[in-house]
Design a protein with these regions (language model features):
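Short microdomains enriched in Cys/His and/or Lys/Arg
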Residues: 51-66
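Conserved AdoMet/S-adenosylmethionine-binding subsite of the radical SAM
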Residues: 62-77, 83-229
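Short, small-residue-biased leader/transition segments that mark boundaries at the very start
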Residues: 3-4
Length: 230
């Protein structure tokens, strides 16, 4: 019950949102368009430290979360977010990705002993949700890139075929030289970058939305979707 509710959100049967008990629950900044803005303004934070005081070690809890994924018959897509996935320390992120990889291996091996029509869905896509390529592009350091490369190499061998960083550039003004450098590094590590854009009337009137799409496409970033929040 509580273990899954706090760390795992489900909106679609084949997708799971994983929110770790780490600094990944926090954000690198506060976005005006955030779906949780109403909660933030009411002082209900996603990272309420009193509420999040651990009742068991994170390693033990992480094992339980992976068991939940392993026993799920439909799961194909895990989105690690928060907060912000890249707010977690490299060591924490490495451990999470290692746990995801081992879970995918166990699930695949278990399917070898299941009859046709009774096999569980296997993991196909892993996503990291982060706005740090915008806010703090220097977070994309050599150690992080090695973690991403290593995970992709191992996970590709067990059927995972999509590796994505989902970020949130809102205007071409945010695509700084530092952000461009971070984008190139992530792409060179073999991960795809997608951008989620919240439609903003003021920015659109000034042509920022159209220009942002052109700039990101030119850098190899896929404009994943544009959404409108009320």
């Amino acid at each position: 019950g509580d273990v899954y509710k706090r760390q795992i959100h489900r909106r679609y049967p084949d997708v799971a949102i994983l929110i770790p008990d780490s600094m990944g629950r926090a954000c690198g900044g506060l976005c005006a368009s955030c779906q949780r803005m109403y909660d933030f303004q009411s002082e209900r934070l996603n990272f309420n430290f009193e509420e999040l005081k651990p009742k068991e070690s994170w390693d033990k809890r992480l094992r339980k979360l992976m068991e939940y994924f392993e026993n799920d018959t439909q799961l194909r897509d895990i989105l690690i977010t928060g907060g912000d996935a890249l707010m977690s320390q490299n060591k924490t992120l490495r451990n999470i990705l290692k746990a995801v990889y081992k879970m995918a291996v166990r699930k695949r091996n278990a399917n070898l002993h299941r009859a046709e029509g009774e096999k569980y869905a296997e993991l196909q896509r892993v996503r990291l949700g982060s706005r740090l390529p915008v806010y703090l592009p220097m977070r994309i350091n050599d150690e992080l890139l090695e973690i991403l490369r290593e995970f992709k190499e191992k996970a590709s061998a067990v059927g995972v075929s999509q590796f994505l960083i989902q970020t949130h550039f809102q205007t071409p003004l945010e695509v700084t030289p530092e952000a461009r450098k971070a984008i190139r590094k992530i792409l060179a590590a073999g991960w795809t970058i997608t951008n989620q854009l919240v439609y903003n009337v003021a920015a659109s009137r000034r042509g920022h939305t159209a220009k942002l799409r052109k700039v990101l496409n030119g850098l190899g970033v896929l404009c994943y979707y544009t959404c409108l929040l009320y």
